[in-house]
């Protein structure tokens, strides 16, 4: 199956989109639910430690009334994005999608904050982020080294200075030749096009998730707990 056109790569601040249903299959894991594949989507799937977008699909059935349904989950397999819904729909139906902007923007803020924190830890102390999970209200990060309380406070202070500097993020898909000479963080070996998210002077990292345009949009970063 052809890979889904991921609109969130280019348009992370858009909240609505139109698409066409390509396939509808019963969910193998959720009884009474269906996995819907669209030609394009704004819904970011669960991947890279980040929870999926939330929102609705409004499906048009020709002359029949429209059907509005919640998107219960979003997964990606082999580049194809599957939207989990509990209402049957038909192939070739037109879809108008609407994502929950507050939820999306919160994820963008938290994910960009994680990049700043991890980038400063890596460049200053040489430790790598080896685990990351983003939930509704908190981000957890695992590093392959131990930071002292003083070092953690230093990182927190520097991150908040980067936020205050309101730097513009740079996002690109470098060619394989460019990637060979580029230093960037990545937790795994990557295949296919690689999306690079750069915060000038702070971090360069391979990442598939939506981010804020400027660091100032993160607001503030605060360390809540250390284990």
Report residues per predicted region:
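A glycine- and charged-residue-rich anion-binding loop/surface
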Residues: 1-227
